[in-house]
């Protein structure tokens, strides 16, 4: 019953997805399965499945609230699996059975409790194959300091909405990653004071 134009949409996706796919191209294999966490409206995975047609994409989110939008957007794609519930704050992460080469997480860890970042790497340790990657995108502090005035203001607005949210410190994220067997490979500077962070499994 849904028209594509009527589906929920985030304008930032259209702005960043091309830049994100350019970074991912350097790290993703030709074949394999990639899990996207916090898929939201499915706008990123809709773009990625066309950009990387030989990869299988698995969308997921903490609830099935927006699955109707994901299903509608990818209904013509043959390389996107049905969306699954993956709650990074839960002790078990839902119906994740197979080995994934990578986990892609875009614009989540600053609008979720810190425990969701821990849960992300805890899950990744269990489901990612050897030498697989975790890709994070979003704003980050470095050395405990904001990299721009706009990020500082954004952080304040996030914390005003929810005290458990906020722009994360990159070094803190790296420590969590290392705890679960991932090392920091590279940080790519992105438009609008965002970063692409690549972690690889030991």
Annotate each predicted stretch with a short phrase.
Residues 4-30:
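Class I SAM-dependent methyltransferase Rossmann-like catalytic core
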Residues 94-103:
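A short acidic, Gly/Pro-enriched loop at the edge of an enzyme's catalytic core
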Residues 131-140:
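Conserved beta-strand signature within the Rossmann-like core of class I S-adenosyl-L-methionine
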Residues 182-202:
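Core SAM-dependent methyltransferase catalytic element
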Residues 111-124:
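A short, conserved alpha-helix within the catalytic core of class I
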Residues 147-171:
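Conserved Class I S-adenosyl-L-methionine
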Residues 35, 43-93:
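Class I SAM-dependent methyltransferase SAM/SAH-binding core
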Residues 38:
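Conserved S-adenosyl-L-methionine
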């Amino acid at each position: 019953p849904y028209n594509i134009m009527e589906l929920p949409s985030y304008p930032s996706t259209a702005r960043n997805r091309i830049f994100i796919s350019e970074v991912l191209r350097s790290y993703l294999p030709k074949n394999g399965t990639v899990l996207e966490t916090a898929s939201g409206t499915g706008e990123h995975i809709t773009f990625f499945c066309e950009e990387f047609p030989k990869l299988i994409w698995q969308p997921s989110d903490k609830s099935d609230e927006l699955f109707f939008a994901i299903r509608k957007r990818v209904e013509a794609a043959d390389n996107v699996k049905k969306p699954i519930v993956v709650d990074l704050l839960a002790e078990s992460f839902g119906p994740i059975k197979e080995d994934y080469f990578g986990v892609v997480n875009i614009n989540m860890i600053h609008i979720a409790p810190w425990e969701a970042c821990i849960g992300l790497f805890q899950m990744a340790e269990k489901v990612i194959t050897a030498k697989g990657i975790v890709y994070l995108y979003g704003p980050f502090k470095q050395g405990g300091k904001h990299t721009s005035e706009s990020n500082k203001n954004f952080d304040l607005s996030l914390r005003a909405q929810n005290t458990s949210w906020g722009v994360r410190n990159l070094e803190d994220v790296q420590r969590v990653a290392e705890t679960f067997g991932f090392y920091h490979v590279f940080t790519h500077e992105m438009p609008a004071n965002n970063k692409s962070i690549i972690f690889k499994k030991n």
